[in-house]
Amino acid sequence: MSVFVYLIRKYLSIPTPGGTASGRERLVDIIIRSSLPKLREKLLEALQAVLPIAAIVLILCFSIAPVSPSILLCFLLGAAMIIVGIMFFTLGAEMSMTPMGERVGSMLTRSQNLFLIIGVGFLLGFLITISEPDLQVLANQVPSIPNMTLILSVAAGVGIFLVMAFLRMLLGIPLPRLLVIFYAAIFLLAAFVPKEFLAVAFDSGGVTTGPMTVPFIMALGVGVSAIRSDRHAADDSFGLVALCSVGPILAVLILGIVFHASESSYLPPVIPEVGDSVELWQLFSEGLPTYLHEIATSLLPIVVMFGIFQLAALHIDRRTLGRIGVGLVYTYIGLVLFLTGANIGFMPAGNYLGQVLGGQSSRWLLIPIGMLIGYFIVRAEPAVYVLNKQVEEVTDGAISAGTMGAALSAGVSLSVGLAMVRVLTGISILWFLIPGYLFAISISFVVPKLYTAIAFDAGGVASGPMTATFLLPLAQGACIAVGGNIVTDAFGVVAMVAMTPLITVQLMGLVAQLKTRKARSAQPLLDPAALLAELPDDAIIEL
């Protein structure tokens, strides 16, 4: 880590102790100072996202689901770290990941070199995915398949489908047509895979599109479409995450068939026990180095690839580079704090709450409580901020961030409710996924193309680390309490969360389309002769 810190210091020219400030150092100082007002704005957004979740959990803890002081204190400290982490990450992604992706995407399109686009696209998808921290967790859940085999296969799947996404945008291939083909292949393969691996396979699609990969991949799409001048360019600026989510699902399903895997394993999170405030801080500080290393490993491939592009083709000015460098530091700090708080503070609390609620006689309360938590928790997903902002910018405000957030919240709320039904009843996940995807793909042929692309991107974005570190442990804890099968009944929450936004966002688009048609039909037809009669003579002559 000391080497990584030294490289950042040298790249940003942050003065070492005893050093003197140069022009570049003053530039970095100006950039940092100019970002402080934005940090305050992001802090308010983070508070609005996390405080409702904290309030719901506190109400449960002080009423029907009592927890130990250790779990409660860990949860509260974790919530504070998540708030600060979201604040830094959202600003950092705006300053670094988004402009980096847009410039690389534009450069690839301008080159008009198909082999370069295919090669770089695959390499980007492969390297970004192989360093995704959540992929390591997924690999440990499938012990019958060697970890490195699974990781390399999933990364290759993302790389291949990122190339397909690029080619789709350049060739103008409709997204619904590709979705029909790929999801038909997925459900065909699912018929030959052991049921123990179905949920894990579908979860992999949401797990691998994490907060590190989503902002960069989405920005690549905007950069590629920005070079096109046709009227469908804005529609095709989304859809990269949608196709990248298909690759991991296919990879895990194929590996499940090849390796004849028969079962998966589940290791419940360790319930923390702390005696005082020093032990509480020690618990978090011991986990901090793990996430410092993980996020550094995740950021490094993106930084290296961008550095190569900068030297070879981009040649961005010094001020913009300084802003990107400061943004990368913010992104790094934000993700480290976020993942530390989520994994050490939220995960044990979610698991224990699930056990307490599932162990009560009125266990049906899991369904409405899960829906309430799901409605608010998606607002705390780091990548959701990036998606909502990008949607608002690309559509020139036609789809506001608030409208997009409401559609995502409704979708995730529904998905968590259905996931809790699965936990309580043991219904196969295919009974939900097949009708859900069939409906989502069917309406994609009548909904405006832009909404379809946004919807399928939103599915990968909504199923982020908050789902994996709180909603999934909540379902696992409840499954333990009711005596269910963890692997078949609890896993699959991520897949459910990734599916329902496809429906809610497209329905939002359908409603908007119907309103537009109704407004146009309600407008009275104007008589040209009457309009001319109302104009003064000078205006008619000018016309």
Where are these regions (language model features)?
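Transmembrane helix-loop junctions in multi-pass membrane proteins
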Residues: I59-L73, A93-E102, L127-V142, F161-I173, ...
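Helix-loop-helix junctions within the multi-pass membrane cores of secondary transporters/permeases
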Residues: G105-M107, L114-A185, R363-S444
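Transmembrane helical segments that form the transport core of multi-pass membrane transport proteins
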Residues: L72-L77, V270-A383
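Juxtamembrane and boundary regions of transmembrane helices in multi-pass small-molecule transporters
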Residues: M1-E25, A165-V180, E196, R228-E273, ...
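Alpha-helical transmembrane segments and their helix-start/interface "positive-inside/aromatic belt" motifs
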Residues: E41-A49, L73-A79, M107-F115, L175-V180, ...
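Hydrophobic core segments of alpha-helical transmembrane domains in multi-pass membrane transport
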Residues: M1-R9, A49-I64, G78-F88, V120-L127, ...
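Interfacial loop-to-helix junctions that mark the boundaries of transmembrane helices
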Residues: R40-A46, V67-L77, T109, V142-I151, ...
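Intrinsically disordered, low-complexity non-transmembrane regions of multi-pass membrane transporters
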Residues: S2-A46, V50, G101-F115, S229-S237, ...
